[in-house]
Amino acid sequence: MPFEIVFDGAKEFADLIATASNLIDEAAFKITEEGVSMRAMDPSRVVLIDLNLPESIFSKYEVEEPETIGINMDHFKKILKRGKSKDTLILRKGDENFLEITFEGTAKRTFRLPLIDVEELELELPELPFTAKVVLLGEVLKEAIKDASLVSDSLKFIAKEDEFTMKAEGETNEVEIKLTLEDEGLLDLEVEEETRSAYGISYLADMVKGIGKADEVTLRFGTEMPLQMDYFIRDEGKLTFLLAPRVEE
């Protein structure tokens, strides 16, 4: 069998895939001895997604030889949503062109997902000269995006030495969420210079769907530069988004 991968906690893995599937229709997953990785760009080429899951976060990880498999993300998401929090998730691939997805809990349930041909693009995650780094709780970011969606289709991030502000302005109303390090929701703030940039709310909303309320989210950005959003999965795995800015006229 080319590979067998076991992850304890099917729902956590499902949330991860659901977040990526909000932005991309299909993806090429690289399965190597080191772990599972995927890098893709949404069809409009506004956001890049980078997923890295080292073998150490899995309870069992056996790979005979490196392989890249193409997956329809919507179909994968729908199957994974059938898993429960306490279910063990088992991903297997034999010699046939199927991914076998098994949930072990009160019963053993197995799905077979046909693999597809996906064009592998050479995508780089660039090192950018960000001037602001913000670490905050997932709940704070998710609620700010919901608040902002009531008044605008873009959300402005403003980082100063001692405060981080998220602001949205509509034709008739506006909303502002302000945080300092005295607030429980802001965990860290590093600012080289006052930094301002705006981003599309629809993309931000998709990017945070799989983030838990207590998860730590790291934002890195510069003035009118892309936003890099990172959050960790079991300390060592990481999901990264790189979102193009909404340049204001």
Curated annotation (Swiss-Prot):
<keyword id="KW-0235">DNA replication</keyword>
<dbReference type="Pfam" id="PF02747">
    <property type="entry name" value="PCNA_C"/>
</dbReference>
<comment type="function">
    <text>Sliding clamp subunit that acts as a moving platform for DNA processing. Responsible for tethering the catalytic subunit of DNA polymerase and other proteins to DNA during high-speed replication.</text>
</comment>
<dbReference type="GO" id="GO:0030337">
    <property type="term" value="F:DNA polymerase processivity factor activity"/>
</dbReference>
<dbReference type="InterPro" id="IPR022649">
    <property type="entry name" value="Pr_cel_nuc_antig_C"/>
</dbReference>
<keyword id="KW-0238">DNA-binding</keyword>
<dbReference type="GO" id="GO:0006275">
    <property type="term" value="P:regulation of DNA replication"/>
</dbReference>
<comment type="subunit">
    <text>Homotrimer. The subunits circularize to form a toroid; DNA passes through its center. Replication factor C (RFC) is required to load the toroid on the DNA.</text>
</comment>
<dbReference type="InterPro" id="IPR000730">
    <property type="entry name" value="Pr_cel_nuc_antig"/>
</dbReference>
<dbReference type="InterPro" id="IPR022659">
    <property type="entry name" value="Pr_cel_nuc_antig_CS"/>
</dbReference>
<dbReference type="InterPro" id="IPR022648">
    <property type="entry name" value="Pr_cel_nuc_antig_N"/>
</dbReference>
<protein>
    <recommendedName>
        <fullName>DNA polymerase sliding clamp</fullName>
    </recommendedName>
</protein>
<dbReference type="GO" id="GO:0003677">
    <property type="term" value="F:DNA binding"/>
</dbReference>
<dbReference type="Pfam" id="PF00705">
    <property type="entry name" value="PCNA_N"/>
</dbReference>
<dbReference type="InterPro" id="IPR046938">
    <property type="entry name" value="DNA_clamp_sf"/>
</dbReference>
<dbReference type="GO" id="GO:0006272">
    <property type="term" value="P:leading strand elongation"/>
</dbReference>
<comment type="similarity">
    <text>Belongs to the PCNA family.</text>
</comment>
